[in-house]
């Protein structure tokens, strides 16, 4: 018994699904060969080939046909019988099979050979790659993609986490994967329990600025003002040396005293030139961490030093007068003293500034007045070209005034030798020393207040604060005068020749004298009370707000800048009320105290 050979299906991957599943028709030659082979295999009763019919080839599906079931793409897993066909004419196939069965009734072995015997299940060939690759047609891929789009309600996309990404994500959606915790930040569940902190703008303050050196100062001298001032100072140096040498040569102690005064004039002139040149640089006005108020406090420090040194000069002259009185007291107690002993005692007194009348002054009267005239001219030029030319001259020492005063006294000194030879020098020295002490102490007192960052009211004489106070006093005085006149006289309407109202003349009565009211208005306590009253009269300042006297701190840090610190206790109110109150207080203080920096601390309860 011969078993028919089973032919494996050959894959035709190049065919489309429509072509693969269509039953092709055979040609006449193919059909005859196909029918003869079948008849030979099955057997004909008469042994005569049957009539040629149109046969349909068995369909050969492509690899997609096998891949549609459980992912098996092996063609060796299914074996078909060539006699088994299906197609359009099912009845013809049935007749052929029926005839074959009837022909083989007598032969049992042949009948058994017609049965379909499945071959043993072959092991699929090992894949070429580790993972099987499934071929997907474009239609199947598009249908699968569309079904996935319709079935999945969420659009999840593949994202790659990069924890070391330097730049933050550009959108809020991309930051969802980086959010830590579940804080209900953007949800109504939070109920504003987690408020964002206030964004504080960093202070734009430099740590330090370059400080100019000596070469920078020389290269930035303003022309021609600084050169004129330096020329006058150089001439004063030569005049001081000449005056000192002439005083030692002719024993004129008055000239030695004059040379000391000229020396202080030179120092003051150089300080003013240095300060004006240094003020051209940025570090002078700009505050840094190293110098919070800049370098302009150097001007205050130098003014204080000159004022203190001037006070020492006045004390030196005063002590010499006391020493001379002690010498006279000793001479008057001894009966044996004479003029020669007085000269010996006078020479033992160091730095004696009391002059002796001698004949050399009368002999060299031309030299005397020539040196005095040169010093007088140079001191006057220094006063007007250097000291008064400075912006803050009224707040600094004016040493040339003392030099000019003493030089004027020396002009008339030779004329007083005959009349007041015994007491002229004592009186002149006492007056000059008193003037120096008064001027030096006045400057030193208020410059020390500025150095200690206290409240100095010297430069507030022309402030609008005093003008407002004066206008208030004038209005109150006018009301008092009108009320007193109304009590004394009956109310009669004044006659007017025109339709315009009669103007009221406001007269201001101020006390004049040595102790006037102007000195009282410059008291820091009075000014702070005036500022406190102005703040409390503001419309934004409510009755439930509290402002104490001790909560107002005013400091003067240099010749121009004031710093005002205010603390207010605010009961109730909103953020808008707080903002409006800050703006109103700042405007009020800027009107009262110009060039000030205001810091307002509001404590809300």
UniProtKB/Swiss-Prot annotation:
Record's compositionally biased regions (Polar residues): 143-176, 473-482
Molecular functions per Gene Ontology: zinc ion transmembrane transporter activity
Topology Cytoplasmic: residue spans: 1-225, 276-287, 331-363, 421-422, 567-605
Transmembrane segments: 226-246, 255-275, 288-308, 310-330, 364-384, 400-420, 423-443, 546-566
Single Gene Ontology BP annotation: zinc ion transport
Topological type in the membrane: Multi-pass membrane protein
Protein's name in the database: Protein ZRG17
Species this chain originates from: Saccharomyces cerevisiae (strain ATCC 204508 / S288c) (Baker's yeast)
The organism's taxonomic lineage, starting at the top: Eukaryota, Fungi, Dikarya, Ascomycota, Saccharomycotina
